[in-house]
UniProtKB/Swiss-Prot annotation:
Its EC number is 2.7.8.26. Belongs to the CobS family. It catalyses: alpha-ribazole + adenosylcob(III)inamide-GDP = adenosylcob(III)alamin + GMP + H(+); alpha-ribazole 5'-phosphate + adenosylcob(III)inamide-GDP = adenosylcob(III)alamin 5'-phosphate + GMP + H(+). It is an enzyme of class 2 (transferase). Keywords: Cell membrane, Cobalamin biosynthesis, Magnesium, Membrane, Transferase, Transmembrane, Transmembrane helix. This is Adenosylcobinamide-GDP ribazoletransferase. Joins adenosylcobinamide-GDP and alpha-ribazole to generate adenosylcobalamin (Ado-cobalamin). Also synthesizes adenosylcobalamin 5'-phosphate from adenosylcobinamide-GDP and alpha-ribazole 5'-phosphate. Its main location: membrane. GO terms for biological process: cobalamin biosynthetic process. Pfam families: CobS. Its cofactor is Mg(2+).
Amino acid sequence: MNSYLLAFKSGFGFLTTIPVGISMEGIDELMKKIYFYPVVGAVLGLLIGAIAYIGQLIFPDPVLAALIMGSVYYFTGFNHLDGVTDMGDGFMAHGSHEKKIKALKDTTLGTGGVAFGMLVLLAFYGSIRSIQDEGINVFGSNLPLLMFASMFIAEVSAKQSMLTIAAFGKPLPRPENQAYPGLGEMTINGATRKNFLIGFIFGAFVCFLPFGLIGLIPYLAACISALVLLNRSYAHFGGLNGDGIGTANEIGRITALIIIAVTLELSLNTGGLEWTLL
């Protein structure tokens, strides 16, 4: 198989629950061409966006918000959310980097992990509902199209957030009994500045060209959120691992949705922003 096709296929095997199959050869190719992350995000965004579009025509808003969340985790799995809970436990641990890393890697779910996981899910739900509430006032009958755009932008932003935090991060020290790099370290090693830039340009293009400012501003905000998370990971652990990269996915998605909701609110109050939806 062509190396680009293998990397693209492996992106779905690695980042989604879609049963395309994955191998170590495929993972190696994906890490060499890790700019496929936002490409996979774009395909996921089209799929989840279509569900949001159709659902907005059928279901009450609160039901659709829950359905969208369920769709996201059905297609992407809970691995990244598991990273959020691990990061929460690590953040809440007291003491040195070593003690915090121990809490980070502990398989037992603690209070910090539960709290962080709940906050992320509540923020996810609340951001979708805010877009629905503000969007009906700005777009009226075009609200289904706004929901499609929002979920597309959110998934592209989520995957580019992973690429962003990996590109600027350094891996945590490898345990002495671990001879080979884990997936987090492989992701960081693959996220070269060149690969980051290719992914960033692709994501900016597909978010801005069809959707204008409603696409670009949330996308950029999600990338910034990844850098903020990286700063906190350095402060608590002295580096970055796969849990942090997975958390960047969740935080990036939510950041994009929140910024869309805030921008809609500002547009409604000021009337000063121009919107482009396809």
